[in-house]
Amino acid sequence: MDKRKESESATNGHLVKRIRIQDSSLITEGSVLQRTSDLNVPNLQMFGHTAEVLVARFDPSGSYFASGGMDRQILLWNVFGDVKNYGVLNGCKGAITDLQWSRDSRVVYCSSSDTHLMSWDAVSGQKIRKHKGHAGVVNALDVLKVGSELLTSVSDDCTMKVWDSRSKDCIKTIEEKYPLTAVAIAQQGTQVFIGGIDGAIKIWDLRNNHCSHVLKGHKDIITSLAISKDGSSLLSNSMDNTVRIFDVKPFASAQRQLQIFEGAIHGQEHNLLGVAWSRNSRFVGAGSSDKNVYVWSATGDLRYVLPGHEGSVNHVDFHPHQDIILSCSSDRTIFLGELN
């Protein structure tokens, strides 16, 4: 693993002020507001990437996060204490489009515009393997959280592929008519949700390679999908400038669309802006091309509009154990901030 030198101060976290639009209260170091996390300070901005940051995700323990983007590198960061970029993973020949952690936090997986998936040992920084098989940009990646650690990926080549993380070879391919841009795998590993440029979200049953349902409502490209913690709801984002929740429980009613959230927008960059559930699934978050992070209650109320970035916010993630939100941007920076 490449390590940052101590002199590279630009990779450290810096205290910043961030305004909650709902009540315009400042959250600053020494604020009288009750602290809600173990962060050293309520809000930090991290520097280190040399190009647009497209994705950032916490590891399952919540002690670390990884970020990647157009500079073809994955940066590894501490969350608590003196927040620093402690390692750099190199090897992809194209932009890092998505990344995931293994459930034991020892492996980092990524998808890339170079048509491959890659995995690294997050402790040693050693490359583990490269997964080859896609014939176009790999836009998104998800990992099964229980049982065998399966990977799912979708690509501009109009296919969704399933991989055994222990092998280089693809174990299943599903072909669609249009390029695919988003994927999420159900907790039990029998269903995969995929979205593409046609605006439809399809539920594929991996046991019989059958599309069991199509979730309709979006009118433009699906940019991100995420399953709720209990597996009952699917969160989606689209270039139609809406974020939606769908009921994906077995034998759900015909009207599966539960919520529509508005506010977050997609701009001329046409980046695949991400969405995320909070740790208790009470809140959802999304990036926006207007440089803000949007957070809603799952019941539909807009709770926060968080400024600070100077470019499109491409991805957000919630901490698995504390009230902390992570965001990354085309401005090459990353924010860590607590929610109160």
From Swiss-Prot:
Q: Does the keyword Cell membrane apply?
A: no
Which Pfam families does its entry note?
WD40
The answer to whether keyword Cell membrane applies is no
This entry carries the following GO cellular component terms, namely: catalytic step 2 spliceosome; nucleus; post-mRNA release spliceosomal complex; spliceosomal complex; U5 snRNP
Q: Where in the cell is it found?
A: Nucleus
Keywords (A to Z) from UniProt: mRNA processing, mRNA splicing, Nucleus, Repeat, WD repeat
Q: Record's Gene3D superfamilies?
A: YVTN repeat-like/Quinoprotein amine dehydrogenase
Subunit: Belongs to the 40S cdc5-associated complex (or cwf complex), a spliceosome sub-complex reminiscent of a late-stage spliceosome composed of the U2, U5 and U6 snRNAs and at least brr2, cdc5, cwf2/prp3, cwf3/syf1, cwf4/syf3, cwf5/ecm2, spp42/cwf6, cwf7/spf27, cwf8, cwf9, cwf10, cwf11, cwf12, prp45/cwf13, cwf14, cwf15, cwf16, cwf17, cwf18, cwf19, cwf20, cwf21, cwf22, cwf23, cwf24, cwf25, cwf26, cyp7/cwf27, cwf28, cwf29/ist3, lea1, msl1, prp5/cwf1, prp10, prp12/sap130, prp17, prp22, sap61, sap62, sap114, sap145, slu7, smb1, smd1, smd3, smf1, smg1 and syf2.
Per its database record, what is this protein's job? Involved in mRNA splicing where it associates with cdc5 and the other cwf proteins as part of the spliceosome.
Q: What is this protein called?
A: Pre-mRNA-splicing factor cwf17
Encoding gene (name): cwf17
